[in-house]
């Protein structure tokens, strides 16, 4: 009788575990995909080849480390730099997705918020903030509302920029504003990818902070190329947003 009782208990426990696993799998399948698609970043999982151009001169920009925090120099201000593939948070969660694969949005906004407020917030913390506030799009990256939403959440000013006025974009960068860009297929991504425009050089080239590549972050870029490769969607004020600290 004792053996029978033990066998029944084990069988019941196994059945309960299987039932729980089946329930969780069912709920995952039933969870609706984000809509509308036009308002989603639509990331890709394939790595982009390194840019076919040399790293910029040390006198123009470089990546430095101070008190365990990385910064990109150049432009009007140093910028807090976070890489979504860094060991510290690559396997951290953005909702149920990995930061390394889907977290360019919160990583880009972590750089912007940390730089403009002076208070560090890392990709793990920003990812949780984005999940809590509805900016995470399961298996697709981020809703494009992430840029204006996060900026306002942290007391920053966010404006949608015209793609026709290159002088305005350069002026904003020269005066210390940061510009978040949602890129389409090209040098930065095969699908959709948030980067930060962080400065302009004397010859008019653009400095960027790419949350997926320190090499691309240390390369200068023509503004024409960046504008040509922006996402074609114009939802939620994108694909170009200027973010600044309030006066």
PLM feature spans:
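Mid-length scaffold segments of soluble, non-membrane domains
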Residues: 120-123, 127-164, 174
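Active-site-adjacent substructure of cysteine-protease-like catalytic cores
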Residues: 157-207, 227, 242-246
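Solvent-exposed loop/turn segments at secondary-structure junctions
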Residues: 87-88, 111, 120, 135-137, ...
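Extracytoplasmic/secreted envelope proteins and their assembly/folding machinery
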Residues: 105-113, 123-127, 144-151, 166, ...
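Extracytoplasmic/periplasmic, Sec-exported soluble proteins
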Residues: 96-105, 118, 135, 139-143, ...
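Short, well-ordered alpha-helical segments in soluble proteins
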Residues: 108, 112-116, 154, 173, ...
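Noncatalytic regulatory segments and standalone regulatory/sensor domains
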Residues: 69, 200-247
